[in-house]
C-alpha cells in the first residue's frame, strides 16, 4: 500500500467497487487465490477462487498454490507509481512499486522463498529441464491498495495502477536471501516477471493476469479501434474476466485457442 492510501484505510465506497469488504487482509487474498472451497463474497456468498477456476478449466490437471504475504508499505505517494506517462499513457513507476515490495518480502521471516522456485521457465542452464529451481521466483502476484485504473481507479483516478503482467526490465536480486544456487545472483534469490492487481480484485482479473504469466495474450482489441471483439465474453482473456453479477466473480472459460496453447506449454 501507500503512505497516502493504506490498505486498511483505502477510502473505498460502493460507488467505487462492488467488491467492497471491511478488511482486505492477507487472509482474504489467500482464500481468493488458493482456496479449494471458494471465498466469501462481499454479500456473504461463496465465490470461485482462482485455484478452483484453473482446476475446473484444466479438468483437474493444473492447479495453483501459494502464500499471501504483506501488506508492505511503499516509500512514496500512490501517484508516483501509478501516474501516467505523458507520452505513452502507461503507469510511470509500477515496476518500482514491485521492487520495493520485493525488498520487504526478502526480509519477511514468514516466507520461505524456496517454496516458490520450482520452475526454470527460461532454461537458464540450457539443459532442457524447465522443472527445476533457477533462483528466480516463479509467479509473483502483487496487489496495490486502490481500484485498478481500468475500473476508474477509485479515489486515485488516473493515478491508479492499471492491472497488467510485465517484467522488471532486468532481474531484481533480493538482497539478504539465500538460494540453493550459489552460482546465480551471488547465491541469492531474484525476481523478474510479475502481475499486479487491484485491492478489490475478483478471481476474474487474477486468473486473467496469471494467464498472461503462463504465456497467453489478450484476446480483446488492445488497440481500441472500435471494430469490435469477436471473442468478447467467450474468453477470460477478453471480456470474460469481467463476467458475473458482481463483475469478475464468475469468469468465463478460456477460448479453445488458449486451451490448446496451455495444453502444449504447461
Where are these regions (language model features)?
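Fold-level signature of zinc-dependent metallopeptidase catalytic domains
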Residues: 1-19, 85-86
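Generic low-complexity segments that are intrinsically disordered, proline-rich and/or Lys/Arg-biased
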Residues: 4, 78, 110, 252, ...
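N-terminal nucleotide-binding beta1-loop-alpha1 segment
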Residues: 8, 32, 46
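Extracytoplasmic/secreted proteins, especially bacterial periplasmic and envelope-associated proteins
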Residues: 19, 93-100, 104, 201, ...
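Structured segments of extracytoplasmic/periplasmic soluble domains
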Residues: 19-23, 32-36, 104, 108, ...
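Active-site-proximal segments of metallohydrolase catalytic domains
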Residues: 37-181
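Extracellular hydrolytic enzyme modules, especially secreted metalloproteases
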Residues: 139-141, 145-266
